[in-house]
Amino acid sequence: MNVTIISVGKIKEKYLSDAIIEYSKRISRYSKLDIIEVADEKTPENPSDVEKSKILEKEAERILKYLKKDSFLITLEILGKELTSEDLAKKINDLSISGKSDITFVIGGSLGLSKNISEISDFKLSFSKMTFPHQLMRVILLEQIYRSFRIISGEPYHK
C-alpha cells in the first residue's frame, strides 16, 4: 500500500513536526508514506468571496500537480462522511483487496478546499463537524492511518 498526504501549508510548530515524524515512522512498518506540502496563499483578514475563491483556486492548482491518476483520492472536508476508526480501517483494507494500492489524502488550507478538488474526490472524509487547524489535522490523520493499519493487522490499539 502507498499512502500520500497532500497538505496545504507548512508545519511551523515543533511539537506538531515531532508528532508527524513519529507517526510517519510508525506507519512505515505497514506502508510507503509520502507527505507533500504545497504552499498556502496569504489570506487577508476578512477576505471577500472573490478573494477566497482566488485563494482556493491557486491552492487547488498546486494540489493538482501532485495528484496521481490511479490513486484513490480521499479529501478531508467538514461536510464529508464521518467514520469510526474501524470503518476507516475497513475502507483502507477494502481498497487494498480491490486492487487499489495507492491512496491519496488531501488536507486543504485555512479556507478549506476548492470545489475543483472536491468534485474529483473519490471519497469525502470528515473527522468532525468542528473546524480544526489544518496543521493539527495532519497529525490527527496520520494517527488514524496508523491506527487503521494496526486494526487491519489484528494488532492491539487503544480504544
Curated annotation (Swiss-Prot):
Presence of keyword Transferase: yes
Keywords (A to Z) from UniProt: Cytoplasm, Methyltransferase, rRNA processing, S-adenosyl-L-methionine, Transferase
InterPro entries recorded: Alpha/beta_knot_MTases, RlmH-like, tRNA_m1G_MTases_N
Cellular compartments per GO CC: cytoplasm
The EC number(s) this enzyme carries: 2.1.1.177
Protein location: Cytoplasm
UniProt GO molecular function: rRNA (pseudouridine-N3-)-methyltransferase activity
Organism of provenance: Methanococcus maripaludis (strain DSM 14266 / JCM 13030 / NBRC 101832 / S2 / LL)
Residues where S-adenosyl-L-methionine binds: L76, G108, F127, S128, K129, M130, T131, F132
The keyword rRNA processing belongs to this UniProt entry's keyword annotation: yes
Task performed by this protein: Specifically methylates the pseudouridine at position 1915 (m3Psi1915) in 23S rRNA.
Protein name according to UniProt: Putative ribosomal RNA large subunit methyltransferase H
Reactions this protein catalyses: pseudouridine(1915) in 23S rRNA + S-adenosyl-L-methionine = N(3)-methylpseudouridine(1915) in 23S rRNA + S-adenosyl-L-homocysteine + H(+)
Annotated family: Belongs to the RNA methyltransferase RlmH family.
UniProt-listed NCBIfam families: PRK00103.1-3, tRNA_RlmH_YbeA
